[in-house]
Amino acid sequence: RDSEDAPKATSVAGTWHFQGQIQSNKLKSITSWSNVIHSLDEIKHFEIIEKVAVHPLEIFCQVSLDGSTGRGGAGIDKVKELASVIQYSSRHRLVGLMAVAPLGVQAAQAFSQLSAIHKAFMVDFPKANKLSAGMSGDFEEAIIHGATHIRIGSSILGSR
């Protein structure tokens, strides 16, 4: 969360990852302290990033596995459009895909689907070889299906 992470990033050195749904009005702040964004799902947000970012960012495009935008993410066609725009940036780097398992879907099924999507995506975007998937309750299944980054903040810091 931007409101929680921004102050911490100024006092603790490291590589800071932003995870969560992006709001246009928060992008200037997010890009001031984060090094990696895990949840980009709109071209308009990337256009803002290009204007306001003070340093280069690594970016994961968030794909929706069930077509719903309620938990963030875009359909794979929209994600490919977004990735095409990012890959031509002189400052920012497309590093992979991110997804959240849909509610009511078994983690194994969701992450198997994501793994297949990611493999097909890398045909067009071979440098996007990272996969951000899995949270505190399902990260083991995500790792089995190729996750390189897991999001387990609530296991470490507690629920927010």
Residue ranges with predicted function:
Residues R1-G137, I143-H145, L157:
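Conserved alpha/beta-domain cores
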Residues A147-R160:
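Gly/Pro- and small hydrophobic-enriched strand-loop and loop-to-helix capping segments
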